[in-house]
Amino acid sequence: MSRRGPAEKKTVKRDPFYRNRVVNMLINRILKHGKKSLAYKILYRAMKKIQQKKKRNPLSILRQAIRRVTPKIAVKRRRVSGSAYQVPIEIKAPQGKVLAIRWLLEAARKRPGRNMAFKLSSELMDATKGKGNAIRKKEETYRMAEANRTFANFR
């Protein structure tokens, strides 16, 4: 048994412009090869594009997109007597938010388009409408969980 005790919870810092934790989480997921200033540029340009197109607060659109994509249930592989089952598990809110951000960025990267800011803004706007690849990923996960509901007792 470990003698260290429970790990301290890290406080998520806020980004300098919007003063929001979710924006900072998104920036840290956009980040590649330690180029944080580029990640800031990408996100702020995407937010500016959203502001120009929708004439609304881009932060509220971001929150709404994340809320729409956030899953409540996921599937986890579990080996039971030699065979692997996809077991549906409930997800807590913070983990769901992390998954939503990851899915939004994955979908934005796969999108055809000019640059990452354009692709990210388009994906966020589609997610608020209930469309886009991130929403499709959530629905696919829910379908998997529904199909494997019989294995829920293997948790």
UniProtKB/Swiss-Prot annotation:
A GO CC term assigned to this protein in UniProt: chloroplast
Domain of life: Eukaryota
PANTHER family xrefs: RIBOSOMAL PROTEIN S7
Molecular function GO labels: rRNA binding; structural constituent of ribosome
Free-text function comment from the UniProt entry: One of the primary rRNA binding proteins, it binds directly to 16S rRNA where it nucleates assembly of the head domain of the 30S subunit.
Keyword Membrane in record: no
The entry's keywords: Chloroplast, Plastid, Ribonucleoprotein, Ribosomal protein, RNA-binding, rRNA-binding
Family that this chain belongs to: Belongs to the universal ribosomal protein uS7 family.
SUPFAM superfamilies: Ribosomal protein S7
One GO BP: translation
Known partners and oligomeric status: Part of the 30S ribosomal subunit.
Entry protein name: Small ribosomal subunit protein uS7cz/uS7cy
Record localization: Plastid, Chloroplast
